[in-house]
A protein has these predicted regions:
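C-terminal hydrophobic helical "lid"/dimerization subdomain
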Residues: 1, 200, 250-254, 293-357
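Glycine-rich beta-strand-centered segment in the early N-terminal region that forms part
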Residues: 20-35, 48-97, 138-141
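Cysteine-cluster motifs in flexible loop/terminal segments that predominantly coordinate metals
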Residues: 38, 75, 85-135, 139
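Short, flexible surface segments
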Residues: 75-78, 167, 258
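Local beta-strand N-terminus motif with an aromatic residue
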Residues: 79, 168, 214, 235-236, ...
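Mid-domain Rossmann-like dinucleotide-binding core that forms the NAD(H)/NADP(H) cofactor-binding site
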Residues: 139-221
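Glycine-rich cofactor phosphate-binding loops and adjacent beta1-alpha1 units
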Residues: 163, 188, 205-285, 347-352
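Conserved acidic E/D residue at the C-terminus of a beta-strand in Rossmann-like folds
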Residues: 199, 266, 290
Length: 357
């Protein structure tokens, strides 16, 4: 099968690999029908994910059809349409029992797919702990509607939940990339008094204004002043930092009112400074974290009910054997791209040389 592979820092390559097989009785093999590229894939490419293993197939956003299941898998069966959770989790350790599946203590727990074990930018993927890592897609929900459930939408859902948003709050979201917009969709469910999105890209700012007219939009240069003008207590009650740029961490806590909650959703390429003398007296509560993907079934129900729709984010589609072009467009933010879908079962004829060690 074709599989997009992490070779070394700065280099991914499309290679031929064997179709994965069941290794554990709790595994499932999924035929990938639709996948996507995430900014975390770019972090691997750029060397910002030290745990990433060279030689693995990248990709952790995907939906597909179950092909095989291990003897102990009971929740799914061959032929089922499923979302694949970005997190691998046992469901039994201290953290899993408390809903913190990102911190699963299993050796392959947490973010493993497409990082430490083979992921889904391929024709097939092996999913450990399939009873927990796969969720049924309702018949009325398309692959496109379900595509982002297992990662960026689950990230936004988790971030909105831990941010303790109330209906009286002014909420600032920094960043209107794919994860930022997914976060926005989940914050909208909380019905806060006011939502402000800070985004430097004119195209993405325009997207937010057109799609979500009830949301206020600011640019980074004027964000603090904009927030002060549009909040009641000297800043935002809740700030969600989803951009991960060089200056956005400071912008996040700088725009927060005293005693606010600042939730760090972004993954940074470089260490960030925590200038405690400057922050003294603001009494901020910081929350950090990658996705704890334990809400996928609830998210799928919300999609089925028409309360969440991420399909406008999918601006481009490519067959798997054109994934290099898909990455070029996504990484360089060309052609108004927000999210790229990779069609795993649609492959244009091409000859790929097998890898020789």
């Amino acid at each position: 099968m074709l599989a997009y592979t992490y070779i070394e820092q700065g280099k991914f390559e499309l290679r031929e690999k064997p179709i994965p097989e069941i290794k554990d009785s709790r595994d499932a093999i999924v035929r990938v029908t639709l996948g996507s590229i995430c900014s975390s894939d770019l972090h691997i490419k750029h060397g910002s994910v030290p745990r990433a293993v060279s030689g693995i197939t990248v990709g952790h956003e995907m939906v597909g059809v179950v092909e095989k299941v291990g003897a102990d898998v009971t929740a799914v069966k061959p032929g089922d349409r499923v979302t694949v959770n970005v997190e691998t989790f046992c469901g039994e350790c201290f953290f899993c029992r408390r809903g913190y599946v990102n911190n699963c203590t299993d050796p392959n727990g947490g973010w493993a797919l497409g990082c430490r074990i083979d992921g889904g930018q391929a024709e097939y993927v092996r999913v450990p702990y399939a009873d927990r890592g796969l969720n049924h897609i309702p018949d009325t929900v398309s692959d496109e509607q379900a595509l982002l459930v297992g990662d960026v939408l689950a990230t936004g859902f988790w971030a909105a939940r831990i941010s303790e948003i109330t209906e009286d709050d002014t909420v600032l979201i920094i960043g209107a990339g794919p994860t930022g917009i997914c976060t926005l969709l989940c914050v909208l469910l909380k019905k806060p008094r006011r939502i402000i999105v800070c985004e430097k890209s004119p195209e993405r700012a325009r997207f937010v204004r057109q799609r979500y007219p009830e949301v206020l939009v600011a640019d980074p240069e004027n964000c603090k002043e904009f927030v002060l003008r549009n909040s009641d207590h000297g800043g935002a009650d809740v700030v969600l930092e989803v951009a991960g740029s060089e200056d956005t961490f400071r912008l996040a806590w700088d725009c927060a009112r005293p005693n606010a909650i600042v939730t760090i959703v972004a993954l940074y390429d470089k260490p960030q400074l925590l200038p405690l003398p400057d922050m003294y007296g603001k009494n901020l509560t910081f929350k950090t974290g990658g996705v704890d993907g334990c809400d996928c079934a609830e998210i799928l129900n919300l999609i089925e009910e028409g309360k969440i729709d991420t399909t406008p984010l999918i601006t481009h589609k490519f067959p798997l054997n054109e994934i290099e072009e898909a990455y070029r467009i996504f990484e360089n933010r060309l052609d108004g791209v927000i999210k790229v879908a990779i069609e795993g079962n649609l492959i244009k004829p091409v000859f790929v040389l097998p890898h020789t060690p």
